[in-house]
Amino acid sequence: MTATNPLSHLSRYKIILASASPRRKELLSMLGIDFEVIPAPVDNEDYPPETPVEDIPEFLARKKAAACDFGDDYLIITADTVVIAGNKVLGKPKNSGEALEMLSTLSGADHKVITGVAVKTAGRMLSFSAVTEVSFAPLTENEKEWYVQTYKPFDKAGAYGIQEWIGCIGVTGISGSYYNVMGLPLHRLYTVLSRLK
């Protein structure tokens, strides 16, 4: 008997990853499905001020998916990731100063990485969020500065990539999906896509 990709039923769709993130593109390709990358046409990432911090990523993922209208035969995947340290939301740093400030906040402490994901077809939109808890060792000023100068983490929530040098030397523990910290919780996404019959 010849085995087939468990997601082969998705071949009836034209799949769009509506994200400019090279990491999400890399991660989605690990599921073995054909897709195209077309970033969502969303100019801002505003959310209602009363939105609980844990709900922000899923709200933004749904907002991005709602802005995408490619036709009935498309399946759209959007995502948004935030880092929450205490009750403070850390998005993408705008400059080196912000990146260093974020790394100082994370240094020697625990934080949460939350990724919201939306999957949209012509008939419906499904969404979820995944939470991963990450523990960081204390970082020296030189370690933080060298990382920011060398890796320029301005496209990463919380100013770090767990798969990069800072993750190797700084992350002491993780509870939850590693891929979620990179920007796409693959197991949860696979489960949702598997159920799209």
Predicted regions and their residues:
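Anionic-ligand binding patches
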Residues: 2-12, 50-197
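N-terminal beta1-alpha1 ligand-phosphate binding loop
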Residues: 3-33
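Cofactor-binding loop segments of dinucleotide-utilizing enzymes, especially the Rossmann-like FAD-
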Residues: 20, 40, 122
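Flexible, glycine-rich phosphate/dinucleotide-binding loops
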Residues: 24, 44-46
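Short, solvent-exposed secondary-structure junction/capping segments
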Residues: 35-36, 81
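A short beta-strand-loop structural module common to alpha/beta enzyme folds
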Residues: 36-44
